[in-house]
Amino acid sequence: MRYTLSLERITLSDYQQLLLKQNLLPGRRILLEQLEARFAMLCDQGLTTVAQLAAALSSPNKLSSLAAATGIPEEYLTILRRELGSLSQKPVPLSDFPACSPAQIRSLAEESIRTSKEYWERGGATQDELFSLCDLVRINGVGAVAARAFYEAGYSSVAAVANAAAAGMLKRVSAVNAEKSYYKAKLGEKDMQFCIDYAKLLVAYS
């Protein structure tokens, strides 16, 4: 199992469904315009996985060539390339996690383990609270603070989130945040559902 998604294993159909459920930034909602038709055009070019799509958009020349071949506007493909970049979560510094033992963080730093990825990959028998937090930040959009709220709400792993129901998860996470004030953002069921769907991708494709 890998820390991040194996983009080679995610089909364009899977990614299309993820986009439909995601709470996209305002500047990226253009991706939902003619989504099904445009993804069908991409498939017609022999692109079947997210890795292949990312490679086809990896340079301005390749992007322009794909736009010419499909008739999809370059602006659309440029924004799609940016959104694809968000599939790979950047590791979180262990020191960013709230309410963790400073002594443990210092001890790990002495072993050159400073990020969520490094601690998660060490794995083994050390599947403690910190490991759970490192697992949770593998989910797209979940940072150190949200991971703490998820953990205290009873979701201690990617698998637990993948098996959650959005309404119930929102209720439990919101209750934790109301008590602890971990974050200021107002989250809704759609945000929880996106986390659940992304967690399912991690379970299936990491």
Regions found by a protein language model. Give the residues of each.
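C-terminal extensions
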Residues: 1-56, 60-206
